């Protein structure tokens, strides 16, 4: 038997994990084992909301060392993280300034300024990326305007996964799928857009040309002295999750469900027409030259904050209590900027309900019901937008990532969207990370080949839409009375 041992480092906004994958060539079987799981979160530092990258690096190294201590020969390592955030380095490779998180308020108002000065349509035609107030384009403008004293010291700007790969290998890389999330990559050249960089105030010399997934960045020297290749995987976690989505045919859509929900479809060509711009659709880079045509939805961040504020530890019990409540009594727009990082999420949700003359969700279960119903309705809205954009309805929706374990939300999504939902795999980002490593090691031919492996090894659950459910009736009523595109606009 021929085995490959690949390690995926998968960092999310709320947690990280080091996972060991064992691939058996002859039977094309893939098994995952969690080596080390650790928390991640936002920190307040010198007036900024930041990431503790030193703690994350220590956790990554701890996980890798654990694998080596077991006597396992690692064939390769790959790192994926969330998008848009970056670390600045000087000529010696030392950090400059703080690793500020995208939920910091420093870029407030700069998106509107960019649209006014450059033109919204021109920015979109250049980048193909949706307008979000925390995109790297606006973060860099905030940095160069608010901290000009740092600029003479900056030699390099590395996005998060590239930074951690650099810390392991000493080699710098700018991976394409994650680079596209910055709104700074030209959609036609796949290189940094000089006009957008100039507006941001960043120096083009801070960046190297983006590289597509599958190259070896460098090597990590394990404690035993072995040189282990570190592969540039599809380092944006959603790009990795999509690779592991067992999409079957062109009529399949995906929803990567976690702190963020990202709904979209794969395409060989980007969509940058007026319809896409009006819907704020993004065309992020994917593997093998594919585009991830999608839309960001605030996701389970709202629930995570409610769990934290209410000190709720038993999520299954909360979901059970939520399921017993009537649907659609409390509806908010999860994509409202007010929910990006409010001081108190529960109060913010209640305020939004009050402003729309709705009952107030008071109990833990009512708050959760508000979030689940609102997300499902927004999923239905976005899926409809995507279908209109491509000119063809979808036949099924694949929900992947940690959020796909929420069976109530899965069923609400199926009912609201009126579409068959297939949930799984849970560790989609990890699996997609591993998939690119196996392709780089010449164990698999391409993404479609890897998806066949996922389909036969992952636990998948199907949810059939119930047209008689409360939320399905609510959607039908909405469609008959509302013509606006955005939910609760």
UniProtKB/Swiss-Prot annotation:
Name of the protein this chain belongs to: Rhamnulokinase
UniProt organism field: Shigella sonnei (strain Ss046)
Keyword Repeat: no
Keywords, sorted A to Z: ATP-binding, Disulfide bond, Kinase, Magnesium, Nucleotide-binding, Rhamnose metabolism, Transferase
Described function: Involved in the catabolism of L-rhamnose (6-deoxy-L-mannose). Catalyzes the transfer of the gamma-phosphate group from ATP to the 1-hydroxyl group of L-rhamnulose to yield L-rhamnulose 1-phosphate.
Pathway assignment: Carbohydrate degradation; L-rhamnose degradation; glycerone phosphate from L-rhamnose: step 2/3
Catalysed reaction equations from the record: L-rhamnulose + ATP = L-rhamnulose 1-phosphate + ADP + H(+)
Active-site residues from the entry: 237
Gene3D superfamilies: 3.30.420.40
Gene: rhaB
Enzyme Commission number(s) of this protein: 2.7.1.5
A GO molecular-function descriptor: rhamnulokinase activity
């Amino acid at each position: 038997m021929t085995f490959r041992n690949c390690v995926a480092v998968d960092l999310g906004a709320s947690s990280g994990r080091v996972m060991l994958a064992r691939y058996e060539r002859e039977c094309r079987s893939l098994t995952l084992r969690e080596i080390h799981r650790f928390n991640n979160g936002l920190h307040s530092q010198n007036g900024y909301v930041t990431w503790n990258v030193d703690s994350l690096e220590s956790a990554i190294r701890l996980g890798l060392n654990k694998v080596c201590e077991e006597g396992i020969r690692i064939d390769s390592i790959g790192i994926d993280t969330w998008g848009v955030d970056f670390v600045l380095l000087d000529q010696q490779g030392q950090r400059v300034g703080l690793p500020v998180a995208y939920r910091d308020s420093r870029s407030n108002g700069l998106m509107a300024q960019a649209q006014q000065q450059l033109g919204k349509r021109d920015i979109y035609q250049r980048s193909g990326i949706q307008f979000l107030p925390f995109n790297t384009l606006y973060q860099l403008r905030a940095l160069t305007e608010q901290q000009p004293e740092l600029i003479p010291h900056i030699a390099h700007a590395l996005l998060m996964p590239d930074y951690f790969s650099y810390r392991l290998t000493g080699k710098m890389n700018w991976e394409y799928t994650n680079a596209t999330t910055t709104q700074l990559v030209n959609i036609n050249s796949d290189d940094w857009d000089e006009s957008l960089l100039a507006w941001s105030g960043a120096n083009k010399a801070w960046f190297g040309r983006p590289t597509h997934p599958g190259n070896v960045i460098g090597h990590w020297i394990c404690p035993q002295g072995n040189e282990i290749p570190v592969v540039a995987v599809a380092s944006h976690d959603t790009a990795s999750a999509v690779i592991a989505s067992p999409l079957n045919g062109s009529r399949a859509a995906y929803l990567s469900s976690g702190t963020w929900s990202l709904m979209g479809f794969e395409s060989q060509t980007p969509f940058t027409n007026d319809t896409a711009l009006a819907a704020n659709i993004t065309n992020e880079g994917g593997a093998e030259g594919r585009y991830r045509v999608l839309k960001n939805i605030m996701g389970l961040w709202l629930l995570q904050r409610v769990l934290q504020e209410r000190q709720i530890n038993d999520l299954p019990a909360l979901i059970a209590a939520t399921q017993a409540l009537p649907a659609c009594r409390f509806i908010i727009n999860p994509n409202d900027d007010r929910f990006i990082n409010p001081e108190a999420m529960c109060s913010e949700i209640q305020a939004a309900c009050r402003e729309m003359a709705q009952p107030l969700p008071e109990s833990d279960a009512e708050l959760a019901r508000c979030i689940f119903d609102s997300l499902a309705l927004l999923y239905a809205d976005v899926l409809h937008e995507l279908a209109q954009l491509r000119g063809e309805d979808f036949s099924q929706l694949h929900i992947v990532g940690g959020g796909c374990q929420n069976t109530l939300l899965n069923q609400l999504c199926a009912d609201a969207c009126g579409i068959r939902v297939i949930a799984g795999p849970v560790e989609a980002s990890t699996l997609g990370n591993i998939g690119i490593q196996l392709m780089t090691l010449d164990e698999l031919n391409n993404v479609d080949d890897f998806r066949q492996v996922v389909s036969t090894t992952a636990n998948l659950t199907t949810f059939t839409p119930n047209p008689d459910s409360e939320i399905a009736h609510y959607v039908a009523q909405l469609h008959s009375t509302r013509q606006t595109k955005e939910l609760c606009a």
